[in-house]
């Protein structure tokens, strides 16, 4: 039945001069199809005698809200609104812009306890979900698996289902290493206070591999962040920072090029290093950090070179990926999309 439906849609698409996905949108009364295009598709359907089946692939009109628009939810697991990071705000902006562009109904839901099964998720008639944060508990997982899903960013633990849009972690680490190497640094160090965060580990792996391939030396100054019940976004302890700084100070010869895993960490590491007499700046110890989260950089002098992960672009692209998934529910394989970062060099 699915094969017949797909073949019929393909014939309609060919006659109308559009893509199969456009035919699917017209069938589902999707609001983002141009009126002229929709009319061409309907004429082609009439000419071919094609009547859509309720069993065809793709999102069904019965899943639409009463207004006829697609309803998606942005679900943030393991935290509350008041603990968000600047990068997350960029993510929200991207999601909101894309949802508005496609005339989607967008529902935000923060779920502090990922083991909780919120009534809002149960009651809302959702066409798809965007997910960020901690992995859900068993009951919530079973509910979310029934809905087309896209994860945003590189979560602490890699999700086992759903598509994903995230920064290109290999490119992040490579950019950091190549920048420091280009500045003449031959002994490098990667600072990370969260070794259980798989995306940050990926940054470190790529950074070290790039340095080694260039004949440089890379030291790993890492600590495991203790997890608590305070949520997905947790602050790093000063005790861990000072312990890591002591490790760095004991290295001989000491690395002069440092890559810090994220801006929340560099806001703690750079002042801690300077308090110990480490001179930071051009021709001295130079630092690269990641995320380009301006609020964390206020008060740092000099400002570190930044790697911008394009959080807003990730948000927009996640909505586009969810649209694709809604239109291709029969595709079993997961799609993981990475967004290219770029470097913002320090003026120092």
Predicted region positions:
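Short beta-strand elements in bilobed, periplasmic/extracellular small-molecule ligand-binding domains
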Residues: 99-110, 208-240
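Flexible loop/turn connectors
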Residues: 246-348
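Short, solvent-exposed amphipathic alpha-helices that sit
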Residues: 40, 86-101, 175, 198-222, ...
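Alpha-helical recognition/docking segments in bacterial nutrient-uptake
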Residues: 2-4, 64-178, 248-254, 264-267
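N-terminal helix-turn-helix DNA-binding module of bacterial transcription factors
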Residues: 1-63
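Hydrophobic structural packing positions in well-ordered secondary structure
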Residues: 23, 41, 95, 129, ...
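An alpha-beta-alpha
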Residues: 174-218, 331-348
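Hydrophobic alpha-helical segments within soluble ligand-binding/sensing domains
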Residues: 164-191, 238-246, 309-327
């Amino acid at each position: 039945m699915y094969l017949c439906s797909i073949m019929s849609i393909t014939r309609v698409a060919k006659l109308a001069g559009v893509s199969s996905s456009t035919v699917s949108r017209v069938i589902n009364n999707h609001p983002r199809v141009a009126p002229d295009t929709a009319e061409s598709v309907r004429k082609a359907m009439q000419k071919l005698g094609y009547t859509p089946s309720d069993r065809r692939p793709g999102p069904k009109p019965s899943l639409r809200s009463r207004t006829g628009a697609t309803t998606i939810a942005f679900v943030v697991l393991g935290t509350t609104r008041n603990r968000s990071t600047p990068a997350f705000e960029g993510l929200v902006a991207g999601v909101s812009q894309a949802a508005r562009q496609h005339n989607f109904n967008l529902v935000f839901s923060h779920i502090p306890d990922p083991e909780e099964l919120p009534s809002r998720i149960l009651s809302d008639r959702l066409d798809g979900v965007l997910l960020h944060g901690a992995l859900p508990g068993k009951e919530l997982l079973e509910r979310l698996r029934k809905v087309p899903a896209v994860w945003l960013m590189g979560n602490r633990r890699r999700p086992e289902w759903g598509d994903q849009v995230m920064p290109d972690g290999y490119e992040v680490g490579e950019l950091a290493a190549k920048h420091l190497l280009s500045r003449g640094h031959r002994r490098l160090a990667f600072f990370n206070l969260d070794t259980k965060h798989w995306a940050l580990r990926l940054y470190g792996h790529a950074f070290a591999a790039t340095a080694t391939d260039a004949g440089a030396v890379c030291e790993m100054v890492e600590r495991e962040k203790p997890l608590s019940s305070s949520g997905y976004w947790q602050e790093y302890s000063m005790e861990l920072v000072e312990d890591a700084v002591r490790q760095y100070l004991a290295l001989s010869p000491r690395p002069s090029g440092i890559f810090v895993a994220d801006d929340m960490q560099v806001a703690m590491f750079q002042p801690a290093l300077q308090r110990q007499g480490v001179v930071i700046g051009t021709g001295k110890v130079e630092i690269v950090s990641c995320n380009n989260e301006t609020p964390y950089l206020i008060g740092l002098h000099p400002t570190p070179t930044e790697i911008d992960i394009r959080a807003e672009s990730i948000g927009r692209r996640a909505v586009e990926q969810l649209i694709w998934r809604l239109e291709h529910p029969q595709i079993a394989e997961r799609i993981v999309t990475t967004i290219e970062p770029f470097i913002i060099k320090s003026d120092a």
